[in-house]
Amino acid sequence: HPICEYLEQLEWDGQERIRYVLQRYMGADASDFVYEVVKHFLMEALSRIYRPGCKADEMLCLVGQQGAGKSTFFRFLALNDDWFSDDLKQLNDSKIYEHLRGHWIMEMSEMIAAISAKSNEEIKSFLTRQKDTYRNPYDKYEEDRKRQCIFAGSTNTRQFIPFDRTGA
């Protein structure tokens, strides 16, 4: 896998960066909670590349003003522009599964895809799926494809997902 190959050729210089990445680039608090959230998000990203189809149920959502660098931050984490996409507009788009292929971090910019979903259940079902079953154009049969991407969200407002009574 090209992302695995890229990651495995990197050498760590001993500098701790994960603990302070959101503080440095997004102005977040330097709390243990923020550190754990970022660490968990990055561990899910790595897991999806090394173990396609593994559980990755959470989505890191950044809230901030227009131009705060939310999308730039996620693009930076993807390491390569080809491994990032912010073009996820609707969860019910027939070509969505083709679009997921080849991308590592899929940003729901301004949470448009989530807002356009019919319900929280539809959002949860889409985000927590471990594989997608679809037929490529001109193929005869559908195939199961294990997910290798994770999802990230960005919005300018804190009111981006409808209230969920289940708490999940």
Show the residue positions of the predicted features.
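Helical "lid/switch" subdomain of P-loop NTPase nucleotide-binding domains
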Residues: 104, 115-119, 168
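Conserved nucleotide-binding/hydrolysis micro-motifs of P-loop NTPases
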Residues: 112-113, 156-160
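Conserved catalytic/switch belt of AAA+ P-loop NTPases
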Residues: 120-143
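A short helix-turn-beta junction within AAA+ P-loop NTPase domains corresponding to the substrate/partner-engaging
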Residues: 161-168
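AAA+/SF3 P-loop NTPase mechanochemical coupling elements
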Residues: 96-101, 136-154
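P-loop NTPase catalytic core of nucleic-acid-dependent motor ATPases
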Residues: 1-105
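Walker B catalytic acidic pair
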Residues: 109-111, 122
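Terminal, non-catalytic protein-protein interaction segments that mediate quaternary/complex assembly
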Residues: 4, 76, 119-125
